[in-house]
Amino acid sequence: MFHNSVKAHKIADVEVGSFLSSGVDSSYVAAVADVDKTFTVGFGKDEKYNEIGWAKEFSKAIKKKNYSKVIKPEEYWGELKHIQYQMDEPLADPAAIALFFVCQIASKQVKVVLSGEGADEIFGGYNVYSEPNATAYDKLPRFIRRGIGSAAGKFHSRKGVNFLVRKGKDLEERFIGNAYMFTPEERKNLLKIETNAPDPQEITAPYYEKVQDCDDVTKMQYLDLHLWMAGDILLKADKMSMAHSLELRVPFLDKEVMYVAEQIPAKYRVTRKETTDKDTPYVTKYAMRLAAKKDTPKETEKT
């Protein structure tokens, strides 16, 4: 099914390439796609921000040529204004900058690229999706969690307070999307003037209403699929690629792939890891990772 999607997205009269990071999404796409060129960017030498070394090893393993670029500080700041201009509107997502540069190097080699956007939203790839079942604390009665959360909110600087406050609220109250900087309360304290902007819950309520009978993981994915992915992920992907006259295609968002993803039970999207690692006790995109293992080189697997 995914192979068919990649094959369909490769149909073009021009050469097609593939973006490649160390993540399973782009790796899966690049491994399945029979393209000659992959493209990667990074910052500095720290592996946390520079995946070029791994991308070159992976490309070599799948017999493809990798084109890469280390983004220098002066290039970052030098293009920032131009990148914001290309976005047409404010977007507080620094990932747009790396995307701009990887599109830049790809556009010099190909006219169409395949990318891994959408996999996190449909297969359950964000760590926050493990939150609903992450602790035994959730088994406490709701009124007790609310009481503890309300009391904990008075001690802003204490470690663990945010966890207790969040767990004292229902999912519909605490989860307003995959990424945000300030809570509504913090926003009101920071802004010097009153605004007529709706509260986040007013925006998310219609979406939660449509999945009110679903499990919490599915609710979170549904919200991100309709707000985060549409308003950020795909928005910046389209605008950063078009800034370089490059066509970006997303095989994971083929309707057949999305249909299959929808049938996967939540426990196979985010599942408990058989490990003693207390910091990462859950595996995200579990079902998709199992599928990807069949096509990606074993020697390049990352934990």
Predicted regions and their residues:
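Structural motif
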Residues: 92, 211-224, 277-283
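Globin-like tetrapyrrole-binding proteins
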Residues: 229
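PAPS-dependent sulfotransferase catalytic core
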Residues: 295-303
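ATP-dependent adenylate-handling active sites, centered on carboxylate activation for C-N bond formation
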Residues: 1-199, 239-295
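A short, charged helix-loop
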Residues: 197-209
